[in-house]
Amino acid sequence: MKKINTFAALLLMAAAAMFSTSCENDNINPYDYVNNGGNGSEGNENQGSKDVITTKVAEYPKGSLVWSKDTTLSESVEIPVGTSLYIEPGVTVTCRSEVQVPVEIVVLGNLYCLGTAEKPVTITSDTKKPADWGGIICGYNSEEVVLNHVDVAYAGATPTESSASFQNKLFKTTIDGGVPAFHFCNVNGKFVMANSFFHDNYNDQTYFTGGNGLIINNIFADSGNAADGGEAINVKAGCKLDVANNRS
């Protein structure tokens, strides 16, 4: 447990240090990096940047994806193994609901949502209704995820056979009540979920089937649906977690 606390502290300290850097660059178009090889404007193969990326917030290593501006998703985004997606403070990611296949953020690599108290990261939907989109679904090889000062809302849609979560064998189409808003399953992976607000999600707010993590200072509200109340923190075997100061 002490090792996990050290990991969490180092990640959050690193995030704070990054915020002191000042550079410039435009945001990467998310559609350059979508779904199994990508069909972006330049035929990007969904492996992140070939060069160091600098923004007004920080400098990111090669192989990164960086969202520094508000982003609207009309299809799922898949972050490949070995690639890291960084979402900067104050960014709002809006998932469209009127789509044939529910939008999902499937993290096979790493995800760092680096919000602050003043500028949280928001992941929401366009119509603000539960089950408008799927959720943040991490794969079996996802190594690290940080959700710090993140507002996650209106997730919980049921996947189809065309969904990225189904294609990667993470969830079935017969799941009861839709996918959770955040799912982590790598027993050797690490995650931090801190200072975040999960609300109005159709199924469980979070669901863990593996991993070493810290869950601290989060708020969970309006979980589940009329048939199934949903759980704030649903933990199964294969997890080693420190959980403290959460409210629901």
Residue ranges and their predicted role:
Residues 1-9:
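Bacterial N-terminal signal peptides that target proteins for export
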Residues 24-248:
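Beta-strand/loop edge motif enriched in small/polar residues
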Residues 19-22:
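C-terminal motif of bacterial Sec signal peptides marking the signal peptidase cleavage site
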Residues 9-17:
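Hydrophobic helical h-region of N-terminal Sec-dependent signal peptides
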